Regions:
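A short beta-strand-loop structural module common to alpha/beta enzyme folds
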Residues: 29-45
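N-terminal beta1-alpha1 ligand-phosphate binding loop
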Residues: 2-30
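Helix-loop-strand module that forms the ligand-binding subsite of alpha/beta enzymes
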Residues: 41-128
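Short histidine/acidic/glycine/proline-rich micro-motifs that form metal-
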Residues: 12-13, 105-110, 136-141
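Charged catalytic carboxylate motif
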Residues: 3, 14-18, 69, 117, ...
Length: 161
């Protein structure tokens, strides 16, 4: 059975609402035979990543970057999960991967730097972006929760085949 790993940093009620919607979408009744594993970013391991067939990542935008918790996750799993480094030690490109991923980011004013920072690291993993990035600014309402639900459902449905 394919496994979808959801890794998130949800320190506020707004971000937790998005996370809950993503998880609910991944568990949609119309999607069968996909195991959904949810891990806070500080608890996710390389084994979780290696045992998954697809990924959903959630983070806040903090000072123009992803959350420290999600960065810690990447620092912890990067090499073991197949990440490529360049000669100067920065993330290199593996040329596109097979495992699908999606991303949601919540910020107050701007999410650009957070999205860019995640994509630069993920670009060096054997993963491929399988859905539009969900970028949410400010309050989280029904429209934002619906988009998060759709993101979760999209990745789970891709794995279900």
């Amino acid at each position: 059975m394919p496994r979808l790993l959801i890794v998130h940093h949800s320190p506020t009620t707004l971000v937790q609402a998005l996370t809950d919607a993503v998880v609910a979408g991944a568990h949609d009744d119309a999607i069968e035979d996909v195991e959904v594993v949810v891990r806070p970013a500080l608890e996710a391991s390389a084994a979780d990543v290696l045992n998954a067939d697809g990924y959903l990542l959630g983070t806040t935008a903090n000072f123009g970057y992803m959350s420290g918790a999600l960065k810690h996750f990447f620092d912890t799993i990067f090499l073991e999960a197949g990440g490529a480094l360049t000669d100067d030690g920065s993330a290199g490109s593996v040329g596109g991967g097979k495992r699908p991923y999606g991303l949601w980011v919540h910020g107050r004013y701007d999410t650009t730097g957070a999205v860019r920072s995640v994509q630069s690291i993920v670009g060096a993993l054997p993963w491929r972006q399988a859905a539009e990035v969900l970028e949410v600014l400010g309050d989280v309402g029904e429209q934002e929760r619906a988009a998060a639900y759709e993101l979760g459902g999209t990745l789970a449905a891709l794995l279900a085949g």
